[in-house]
Amino acid sequence: GLLMSVFLFARIAFELSFDNFYHDSDNLYIVKTGWLKNGVLEGNESRFTIIPIPAAIAEEFPEQVESSTVSCSLFDNSFQLGERQLDLSTVMADTLYFSVLGLEMIEGNPQDLAGPDVVFLSAKSAKEAFGDENPIGKTLRYDFWGYQTTLLVKGIFADIPLNTSLERRPEAIISFPTIGRHLKWNLGWQSGGNYDGYLR
């Protein structure tokens, strides 16, 4: 009885702590999208959006929205370091990802995500890949959809706890220009609705 109560309280505490680790978490919002047909909402709203929507909301409501960011989960998570393969949960993100979500940077400048072939690693992933060596300036090979590129490690961020609403808890964050350059993805209003948008 007592042991079960301890487990139950621990689980409740974990559930109630979701997203509380974000800086000023009460002012962080996920952009949800509803699709209208003839003015009527079709189906359920989705947590996915198209790239320009969060920035357009921030521009339209400057007094309510301080900043916005967009990210996209990638399902090719295979990195090569010499002969070793690392499987890391990967997202691509823009330069405002860390400031909007309030994630802690250990080393590096989020503005580096404006350039191509850049990757930021979580502290745990950096340790897994490079041990006690400083990973900044080191390279990893990344394979996605038949393309290969060499990524330069330019930043380290604090590990994201398990109690997050993020669709994927990133262990590696790749810059949008990396994917856009190789795949020529449409990053505008015709980009499709597979992106996560956040407002602060």
Predicted regions and their residues:
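Generic structural signal for beta-strand residues in well-ordered domains
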Residues: 8, 21, 112, 133, ...
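Mid-to-C-terminal secondary-structure elements
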Residues: 94-107, 119-200
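Short, flexible, glycine/charge-rich loop motifs used to bind or transfer phosphoryl groups or to couple energy/partner
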Residues: 18-19, 55-59, 88, 107-110, ...
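Membrane-proximal extracellular/periplasmic loop immediately following the first transmembrane helix
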Residues: 9-76, 190-200
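Residue-level marker for well-ordered alpha-helical positions
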Residues: 51-55, 92, 99
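Short acidic/polar micro-motifs at solvent-exposed secondary-structure junctions
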Residues: 34-46, 69-96, 106-118, 142-151, ...
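Generic hydrophobic, helix-prone segments enriched in Leu/Val/Ile
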Residues: 21, 61, 79-81, 90, ...
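Alpha-helical transmembrane segments of integral membrane proteins
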Residues: 1-4
